[in-house]
Design a protein with these regions (language model features):
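Glycine-rich, proline-tolerant flexible connector loops at the mouths of alpha/beta enzymes
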Residues: 43-63, 81, 204-205, 313-323
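Active-site mouth loops of central-metabolism enzymes
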Residues: 12-26, 80-88, 173-183, 282-291
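Hydrophobic faces of well-ordered beta-strands that scaffold small-molecule active sites
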Residues: 3-5, 44-46, 75-77, 106-110, ...
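Flexible, glycine-rich active-site loops centered on histidine and acidic residues
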Residues: 2-22, 84-152, 197-199, 206
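Acidic (Asp/Glu)-rich catalytic clusters
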Residues: 37-38, 63-72, 94, 98-105, ...
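Conserved, mostly hydrophobic/aromatic
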Residues: 3, 40, 48, 66, ...
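An alpha-helical appendage that flanks or caps ligand/catalytic pockets
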Residues: 5, 128-166, 208-308, 340-346
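N-terminal beta1-alpha1-beta2 module of alpha/beta enzyme domains
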Residues: 1-70, 74, 175
Length: 346
């Protein structure tokens, strides 16, 4: 089981709650990735967002910078919003990062965007949501599977490629491409039919209820003739601290801030601390606790989903940077070995 973290960037807050510099948020994210590598985490994902509170707008640039400053950790986009980006550029940026890393440490997770701020930003129509994603995912896979630098492709959402060079190629020839989903059955079936590993973003509810989706994914893959590379990963909110109470107290303010912001955008009701506490204990979706608590809950979920990677987002809503760094260290040095021991004993 790989243990990791992910982030959309987290702009720090002043004491009065006003945001500091988004550039500071990016520097903090870079420092966190380097710290995660040194601590021994397996994976760090950078999710594309374009808001003042979540400023990680260029995963490829951050991954390339981190690739030069790290030596072991797997780096990936979590996710790249390919519906509103050019898959040629996404591939080139991540292949460049792969070359900088020495090869074998860079992945792409392709998403279509549950947060839709990229559509007005880049001039796309939400009415084309499904068509954009389907065609651009096909283009990304076509580029990745090409045996040479030369690629041909045609579709309706982008100009045709007619034996054009797409460079650089990844060190090993291809990059791992994951399909991101928040729990859509059609996306699970699509990932299986395409033979792609699937990454579930679970931000609420009871994660074990995703078991039918993982079964659908594996069944779809088998029916399509795919047996290799059929993998499941899970991304959840989570923060690790020396004690459960410390973790709960540290994570709550950022969670509250995020839900106030999302409530304004999406018409949600006011965040409720009782809901937060319920989600932060089994069988809820927030992996907020001490190392024993978090490890045990990851292993419990593994019994339902059989996932090979679990990664946590802790920095949201202005979480103090030192709390994130401590969480990353505890994930690597305390949670990861506990998970390994618990799985070995099953």
């Amino acid at each position: 089981m790989e243990i990791g973290a992910y982030s959309f960037g987290d702009t720090p807050l002043n004491p009065d709650g006003s945001p500091r510099s988004t550039a500071e948020g990016i520097r903090n994210l870079f420092d966190a990735i380097v710290a995660a590598d040194r601590a021994g985490l397996d994976y760090f994902g950078i999710g594309e967002h374009h808001t003042v509170s979540m400023p990680a707008s260029s995963p490829g640039a951050l991954i390339a910078a981190a690739a030069a400053a790290t030596s072991q950790i797997i780096l990936g986009s979590a996710a790249s919003i390919i519906s509103t980006d050019d898959p040629v550029r996404v591939f080139q940026q991540l292949a460049t990062a792969d070359a900088i890393s020495g090869g074998g440490r860079v992945e792409i997770t392709a998403g279509r965007g549950s947060s839709v701020e990229t559509f007005p930003l880049f001039g796309y129509d939400l009415a084309d949501y499904d068509r954009l994603y389907a065609e651009k995912l096909d283009l990304l896979m076509t580029i990745n599977e090409s045996p040479t630098e030369t690629v041909s492709w045609s579709g309706t959402v982008r100009p045709t490629l007619d034996e054009l060079a797409v460079v650089p190629r990844p060190v090993a020839g291809r990059l791992p491409i994951w399909l991101a989903t928040g729990g859509n059955a059609a996306s699970s079936a699509r990932a299986g039919k395409l033979g792609l590993p699937v990454s579930y973003g679970i931000i609420g509810g009871e994660p074990h209820r995703f078991a039918p989706l993982t079964e659908l994914y594996r069944r779809s893959a088998a029916q399509a003739g795919y047996t290799e590379n059929i993998k499941v990963s899970v991304a959840t909110f989570g923060l690790v601290a020396p004690t459960k109470q410390e973790a709960l107290d540290r994570f709550y303010p950022g969670w509250h801030n995020l839900n106030v912001e999302m409530g304004r955008l999406r018409g949600w009701g006011a965040p409720d601390r009782r809901q937060y506490l319920a989600q932060s204990h089994a069988p809820g979706a927030y992996y907020v606790g001490d190392p024993d608590d978090v490890a045990e809950r990851i292993v419990h979920l593994h019994g339902y989903l059989g996932h090979m990677r679990h990664f946590l987002q802790g920095d949201l809503g202005g979480l103090p940077h030192e709390h994130l760094l401590e969480s990353l260290t505890l994930l690597a040095t305390e949670v990861k070995p506990r998970v390994a021991r618990l799985l070995a004993a099953k």
